[in-house]
């Protein structure tokens, strides 16, 4: 039974309808809901009592209004109440690196590739992700292509984290109540509050994260949400070219939560000794294409078997180094962002990140499907 302060069990269908319609009317008037109101709405959704048409209207309305800090905090709190959590023993230097999605760029899976680099550098990675909803290659799609068995239990995922230093928390295995929202999200095919909630609801209780957002005006609000939820060291990043990653092409806005304070600043690739470059060639049409580019980049080799131009591979490495460097930094393995990027570059040259990916894939195949 979810440990939630609110329950819909004693509400009649008419009462649920009234709560939902009242909330929708306020949202459409661009009035923010209180945390208590949003907790009740999210509990109704998680209990499967929100009709699809109403859910679509609520998600669209929140998107158009822009979700408030209180609305996001309350929603994340309810999702965590309903989640199947795990508690890995090796929590020192534990990190997640994840994007909200919804940026429409169709880049290769930068955060997933970066996770293997961070793990190879010594971080414990609890990677939370899902299938692509508004992109052509979600992290789960990519990892299945790489040979990972995602049909494992939460406890088996915990075992991966403890033995391999990295595990992939496939959202449907941990957030089973989210099944009620999947049809509507797939039908909408645009970013919703659930894109925002994914990074906030890591079932391993990760306190150090790099989180990419689809628009940089979400950086500071989301950093404050993380503060509300008890996170320790977080970089919320959104680039000027509207990527939910640290961009190789331009400046990236950062809202950094550290020591209980949120600081906002801009970073450039040159800050970490990397030249700015266009993103041409880094977009993909499928998880297969994304995997090929990532394997070539993580291999450390100067040639590849996929027929990919080496300049594209080198560009992908630079993009991965920037984002993995941030993860290494917030995990506590680097004194600052540039030092983290330098560590990431060394890992990329060594080929250890690809070995980490292959080892995790092999380990997950030892579990019964």
Swiss-Prot record:
Q: Does the keyword Magnesium apply?
A: yes
Q: Please list the residues that bind 5-phospho-alpha-D-ribose 1-diphosphate.
A: 99, 102-103, 109-112, 127-135, 139
Gene Ontology MF terms in the entry:
anthranilate phosphoribosyltransferase activity; magnesium ion binding
**Any Gene Ontology CC annotation:** cytosol
Q: Which GO terms describe its biological process?
A: L-tryptophan biosynthetic process
What keywords are annotated for this sequence in UniProt? Amino-acid biosynthesis, Aromatic amino acid biosynthesis, Glycosyltransferase, Magnesium, Metal-binding, Transferase, Tryptophan biosynthesis
Provide the binding site for anthranilate 2.
Answer: 185
- Catalytic reaction annotation: N-(5-phospho-beta-D-ribosyl)anthranilate + diphosphate = 5-phospho-alpha-D-ribose 1-diphosphate + anthranilate
Q: Which residues bind anthranilate 1?
A: 99, 130
What functional role does this protein have?
Catalyzes the transfer of the phosphoribosyl group of 5-phosphorylribose-1-pyrophosphate (PRPP) to anthranilate to yield N-(5'-phosphoribosyl)-anthranilate (PRA).
Record's HAMAP family?
Answer: TrpD
Q: What is this protein called?
A: Anthranilate phosphoribosyltransferase
Name of the gene this protein is made from: trpD
């Amino acid at each position: 039974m979810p440990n939630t302060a609110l329950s819909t069990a004693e509400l009649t269908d008419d009462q649920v309808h009234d709560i939902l319609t009242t909330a929708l009317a306020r949202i459409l008037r661009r009035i923010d809901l209180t945390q208590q109101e949003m907790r009740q709405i999210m509990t109704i959704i998680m209990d499967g009592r929100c009709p699809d048409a109403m859910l679509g209207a609520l998600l669209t309305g929140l998107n158009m209004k822009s979700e408030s800090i209180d609305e996001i905090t309350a929603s994340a709190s309810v999702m965590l109440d309903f989640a199947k959590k795990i508690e890995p023993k090796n929590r020192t230097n534990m990190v997640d690196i994840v994007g909200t999605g919804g940026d429409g760029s169709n880049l290769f899976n930068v955060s997933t590739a970066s996770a293997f680099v961070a793990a190879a550098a010594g971080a414990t990675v609890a990677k939370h992700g899902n299938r692509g909803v508004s992109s052509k290659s979600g992290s789960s799609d990519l990892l299945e292509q790489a040979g990972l068995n995602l049909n494992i239990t939460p406890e088996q995922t915990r075992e991966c984290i403890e033995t391999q230093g990295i595990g992939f928390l496939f959202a449907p295995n941990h957030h089973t109540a989210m099944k009620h929202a999947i049809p509507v999200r797939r039908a909408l095919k645009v970013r919703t509050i659930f894109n925002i909630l994914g990074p906030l609801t890591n079932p391993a209780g990760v306190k150090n994260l790099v989180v990419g957002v689809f628009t940089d005006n979400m950086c500071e609000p989301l950093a404050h949400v993380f503060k509300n939820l008890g996170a320790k060291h977080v970089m919320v990043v959104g680039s000027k070219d509207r990527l939910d990653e640290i961009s190789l092409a331009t400046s990236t806005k950062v809202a950094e939560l550290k020591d209980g304070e949120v600081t906002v600043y801009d970073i450039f690739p040159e800050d970490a000794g990397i030249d700015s470059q266009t993103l041409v060639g880094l977009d993909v049409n499928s998880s297969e294409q994304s995997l090929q580019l990532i394997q070539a980049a993580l291999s450390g080799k100067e040639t590849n078997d996929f027929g990919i131009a080496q300049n594209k591979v080198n560009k992908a490495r630079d993009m991965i180094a920037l984002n993995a460097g941030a993860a290494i930094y917030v995990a506590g393995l680097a004194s600052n962002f540039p030092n983290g990027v330098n560590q990431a570059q060394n890992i990329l040259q060594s080929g250890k990140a690809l070995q980490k990916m292959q080892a995790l894939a092999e380990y997950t195949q030892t579990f019964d499907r």
